[in-house]
């Protein structure tokens, strides 16, 4: 596999200058230091968390759902040149209490958040610490490999978090049918089986139809409330709610659909939820928990799931654009009639 790559001294980097504008600027291609890899970025998935940088500007080339090829290794690295793979967002230290427990998403001494603090997947090249690189097989399409990150990783981790509190659920509701919500729905189906009831609520028809293709039962909130929908379909409630919206109205309304012993999982950052501790939590033994990204050690399991269910999972990807059309890609994504949108280069 090992081979030599011609690495230019400079390359065109997309720069988010604010006001929804992106310009390309020549920058020097960085050198990897000890323990670091230089990645030639080949695919990056758009995410709603990119939008603040699109609006306000960023000092780096962002993109945290990055898949690419190792083209150079720094001193002490062992990854072969030419290896394809994906980049785990969090530059975990590997030495703190959390990391020693395998809880790399809870590292207390992170060295980077790739795509937020350091150049990410929209850049032509990015430098990462070797420990955040996860290799994939040569036959894997790198655009599809990005699903190992926010789609599969975040989705599956949230389900595992729920199972820690409710190991025998009979139903699940996802709030929000954006890419993260679609990922949660897909991973729920793969975790619990095709006959397990997975409901998903949103107001955008395009995304709800996509969720139906994944096997979820869609709830169009423009037509009825959650309570009305469940009453019409003789559903008393659900055992798990996973909120990907971060919106108070979504959290409040969906929490009221939880059964006894139900688990409410907050995946989306954002707004608040107000609860009556006695009535909402204690009496019914419900739990409200958070779920942050996922752990690096979950990648191997998710990769096996990906290999076995590739055709099913890649339905989440609905649009692909070359890096030269990154502005058009964000315009399409902002319109919300998409699933996962991928930039390729």
What are these regions (language model features)?
Residues 1-9, 205, 252-253, 296-345:
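C-terminal hydrophobic helical "lid"/dimerization subdomain
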Residues 93-175:
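NAD(P)H dinucleotide-binding glycine-rich loop of Rossmann-like/cofactor-binding domains
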